[in-house]
A protein has these predicted regions:
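Glycine-centered hinge/linker elements that transmit conformational signals in sensory
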Residues: 174-178, 218-252
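C-terminal lobe and pocket-closing loops
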Residues: 274-289, 300-387, 420
Length: 421
């Protein structure tokens, strides 16, 4: 498998902004496990997980040195750490990292340990498959969710409108902002959330960002297929129409998930496509999160329903000297006790769920879930973000952006030895 040579990226300035580690020295006779997480600081998942980490430390005699990052910052920092040969033991990750990190050779093969893990039967085949590449298990899941269209019901009731079911329903509300003093919805245009949202809108027209070919490699075929290019053009035009019709804030072109989730949780916007981790905001923002309902993501009238399915892996780094202890901590994260405490509404385990809307209403959308292909995605993700910017910031036409993205995806695949010729 192709091994990517990673050049060092200077991110030292980022580290100074991170949360201080939980622990800094090992207990007598124990190991120190370097853990990198990406939870929302101060939210329920962090609070419950800190308690569970302390319990694990007491039970094992090991110490966890935990540092928190955003996913984007973690991704950049792990590339630097891998290039320098100074990696942590265990990190949170996203599905987009599976192919990239595996191709780079920086994550451990957990297949043997996983097969011996007594709790593995609590995971469905689809979850295990999401942790697997080339028939090797390289991750332990800690969270699974799909995306849904969250709605502040009181806002829509006041506005006298029904929950939008289609793109056309959204675009018809061009007077919503003027009448209600807030925007109807929003989109992420930067960071990992932007490419995830774009993937869904493409899937609603039956499009893939890269399709498997007969030789086992991948290719974006839009520029070779007039119908596909026309559909991709419609997707980028949708972004522009949202701005032009004042459905979303003009400033959204510079926003990532941090701004969009915050805006919805605090009632600044009336609807948003996001995940059920926002259940945590019911306790931190009770005044604005009490009227939220869960709906399918609006789709084009000439398209089909789709959502993003995300099963997040924990990776043990190949360079770790504490793989056994890191595996024990990773499987502790995935244990029924820990999942019920910290991830009850979004657990990858089949025996952990709740009766809340955050669990059952999201799960009802899973049949329309789509995922990224198992290829190196860092270049593709950035190209997807850049393609949105070409429309919303650079003034390119929707067709120009779609055609450019098709070429950019194939260029990334070629760079990583994954392009079907």
């Amino acid at each position: 498998m192709f091994k990517k040579v990673v050049s060092a990226i200077m991110v030292a300035a980022m580290v100074g902004t991170m949360v201080a580690p939980v622990s800094v020295s090992a207990k007598d006779g124990g190991k120190t496990i370097e853990l990198w997480t990406c939870w929302t600081e101060g939210a329920d998942t962090e609070k419950a997980s800190q308690e569970m980490i302390q319990k694990w430390e007491e039970e094992t005699g090991n110490t966890v040195n935990q540092t928190n990052f955003t996913y984007d910052m973690l991704h950049e920092k792990i590339l630097t750490a891998a290039a320098g040969g100074n990696v942590p033991d265990l990190i949170w990750g996203l599905p987009e990292y599976v192919g990239e990190f595996y191709n780079m050779g920086i994550v451990a093969d957990l297949t043997d340990k996983f097969n011996e893990w007594e709790d593995k039967d609590a995971l469905s085949d689809s979850v295990v498959n999401a942790m697997t590449i080339d028939n090797k298990v390289i991750g332990i899941p800690y969270e699974m969710t799909v995306r849904a269209y969250l709605v502040h019901d009181d806002d829509l009731k006041t506005a006298g409108i029904e929950t939008p079911a289609t793109w056309e329903d959204l675009l018809a509300q061009s007077d919503y902002y003027d009448n209600n003093g807030k925007y109807l919805t929003e989109v992420a245009c930067t960071g990992v959330r932007a490419s995830q949202e774009l993937l869904v809108y493409l899937a609603q027209y039956g499009l893939e960002i890269a399709s498997a070919q007969d030789d086992g490699k991948y290719k974006n075929t839009w520029n070779e297929n007039k119908d596909e290019l026309e559909k991709a053009t419609k997707v980028f035009q949708f972004y522009q129409d949202l701005i032009d019709n004042k459905i979303i804030d003009f400033s959204a072109k510079n926003w990532g998930w941090e701004e969009t989730d915050e805006n919805f949780a605090t009632g600044i916007t009336s609807t948003y496509v996001t995940g059920n981790w926002l259940a945590e905001r019911e306790s931190s923002n009770p005044d604005t999160m009490g009227d939220v309902s869960v709906a399918p993501i609006p789709y084009p009238a000439d398209g089909q329903p789709a959502t993003y399915m995300e099963c997040k892996p924990m990776f043990i780094m190949e360079g770790s000297e504490n793989k056994d202890e890191a595996f024990d901590l990773a499987t502790a994260f995935c244990s029924k006790e820990w999942q019920e405490a910290a991830f009850a509404d979004r657990s990858p385990r089949s025996d952990v769920s709740t009766d809340s809307k955050w669990s059952k209403d999201f799960s009802a959308l899973a049949d329309t879930g789509v995922t990224f292909p198992p290829v190196t995605l860092s270049g593709i993700n950035q190209a997807m973000v850049d393609s949105i910017a070409k429309v919303l910031q650079e003034g390119k036409t929707a067709e120009e952006a779609a055609s450019w993205l098709s070429d950019a995806v194939n260029a990334s695949l070629q760079e990583n030895g994954e392009l079907s010729e």
